[in-house]
Regions:
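Bacterial N-terminal signal peptides that target proteins for export
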Residues: 1-11
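C-terminal motif of bacterial Sec signal peptides marking the signal peptidase cleavage site
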Residues: 18-21
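Extracellular/lumenal/periplasmic "stalk" regions immediately C-terminal to a signal peptide or transmembrane helix
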Residues: 23-98, 111
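Short, solvent-exposed beta-strand/turn patches at coil↔beta or beta↔helix junctions
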Residues: 64-67, 92-121, 143-155
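Periplasmic peptidoglycan-binding/anchoring modules of Gram-negative envelope and division proteins
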Residues: 74-84, 109-140, 169-173, 211, ...
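Soluble periplasmic/extracytoplasmic beta-strand elements of cell-envelope proteins
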Residues: 87-89, 94-104, 135-139, 167, ...
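Extracellular/periplasmic catalytic domains that process cell-envelope and extracellular macromolecules
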Residues: 88-91, 119, 131, 178, ...
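Periplasmic OmpA-like peptidoglycan-binding domain that tethers envelope proteins to the cell wall
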Residues: 109-114, 142-216
Length: 216
């Protein structure tokens, strides 16, 4: 009995050990599967990051190229517009030709000065040559002085700025070989100042018409 009992005990002990070993093996296999899955996930995430980095690098290169192109265009236009009283700036990623109201109009008026037509003719030639197919927005801007002398004509600076923008737009349509379906105007009144409006000099800077070339 003692011998048989010992054999039985050994048998069951072997089964227990085998069972434990199998369980551990199964657990290790499951851990390996999970680790493999996690490695694959990390590899996928890494590839995604590489792709995003490459896209970011391409976008940065594109932005630098666009910035250089705009700055080259700005310098070229400024050189050709010397002596006209007209300036050129980069505005929200677009070329903007800035025409002071003092160059274009007499005080409170909407009729173009004779000298203004000479300046606008030069602007026309540049737009025809450099931007024949671009959309163009003509913007009117004023200072913050309320309308007084011409109150019967213009209820507010919005109306005055819009009418002055329209005057310039009509000149472009009549004298430039530009597609009129790609030109439009906006009157901003005093609400997009470029200076403080605290004195005559800053107010003069705010009274302007801008021709914005909406390049892609």
């Amino acid at each position: 009995m003692g011998f048989k009992s010992g054999v039985v005990k050994c048998f069951f002990l072997s089964l227990i050990i085998l069972s434990v070993g199998c369980a551990e093996l199964t657990s290790l296999r499951e851990e390996k599967v999970l680790m493999t899955q996690r490695i694959e996930e990390l590899q996928g995430e890494n590839e995604g990051l590489d792709s995003k980095y490459a896209t970011s690098e391409e976008e940065n290169a594109r932005l630098i190229e666009e910035k250089n192109r705009l700055e080259d265009a700005q310098r070229s236009m400024e050189e050709r517009l010397k002596g006209t009283g007209v300036s050129v700036k980069i505005k929200e990623g677009h070329i903007s030709v800035v025409l002071p109201s003092s160059v274009l109009f007499n005080s409170g008026q909407i009729k173009l000065k004779k000298a203004a037509k000479n300046s606008l003719s030069k602007v026309c030639r540049i737009l025809e040559k450099d931007f024949p197919n671009e959309y163009i927005r003509v913007e009117g801007h004023t200072d913050n002085d309320p309308i007084k002398r011409t109150k019967q004509l213009y209820k507010s600076n919005w109306e005055l700025s819009a009418v002055r923008a329209a005057t310039v737009l009509h000149y472009l349509i009549d004298n430039c070989h530009l597609d009129p379906t790609k030109l439009y105007l906006a009157g901003f009144g005093e609400f997009q100042p470029v200076a403080s409006n605290k004195n005559k000099i800053s107010k003069k800077k705010n009274r302007r018409v801008e021709i914005v070339v909406l390049t892609d």
